[in-house]
């Protein structure tokens, strides 16, 4: 069993974000990748990654959310009703959640989500910590640690030499971002 992952995202403007996320999940060895996206993205996604299962009905998404498989929420989402409807389905469920930081900014409160991994770039990290972007650039390691402590999650601070920290141990990816 190589595990399962449910990816939720891909708004009108950013279907490429979910395509990239799903491709990387497959390439990293996830055995079964489910994807919930807007209807207009389904054909684009299946042309690029025919081996994943694309959900096109909210009731099927709700059923999968009850299975407690890990969820990557937010790649390619924007602040709108669709995004908030998904959050309403996810909240107060015991999900293991990987959150795109832009999604966190949209839903405003993550109290009802069990976040395990947070994926911000420097601009998103600055907004989540309520500091200028320049302070994140100046001290990426401490910024990532602060995010991990604030959200009690592993933080993957994307960028040149991506940082991964749980708030105690920090690793730097020297092979690109």
Regions found by a protein language model. Give the residues of each.
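Short, conserved phosphate/pyrophosphate- and ester-handling motifs at nucleotide-, phospho-/glycolipid
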Residues: 121
């Amino acid at each position: 069993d190589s595990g399962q992952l449910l990816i939720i995202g891909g708004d009108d403007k950013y279907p490429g974000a979910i395509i990239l996320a799903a491709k990387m999940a497959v390439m990293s060895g996830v055995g079964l990748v489910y994807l919930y996206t807007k209807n207009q993205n389904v054909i684009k996604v299946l042309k690029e990654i025919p081996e994943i299962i694309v959900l096109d009905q909210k009731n099927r998404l709700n059923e999968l959310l009850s299975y407690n498989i890990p969820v990557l929420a937010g790649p390619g989402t924007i602040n709108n009703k669709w995004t908030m409807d998904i959050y309403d389905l996810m909240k107060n469920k015991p999900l293991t959640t990987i959150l795109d930081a832009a999604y966190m900014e949209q839903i405003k409160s993550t109290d009802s989500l069990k976040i395990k991994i947070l994926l911000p770039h420097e601009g998103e990290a600055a907004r989540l910590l309520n500091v200028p972007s320049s302070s994140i650039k100046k001290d990426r390691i401490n910024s990532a640690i602060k995010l991990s402590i604030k959200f009690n999650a592993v933080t993957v601070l994307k960028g040149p030499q991506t940082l991964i920290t749980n708030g105690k141990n920090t690793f730097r990816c020297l092979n690109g971002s």
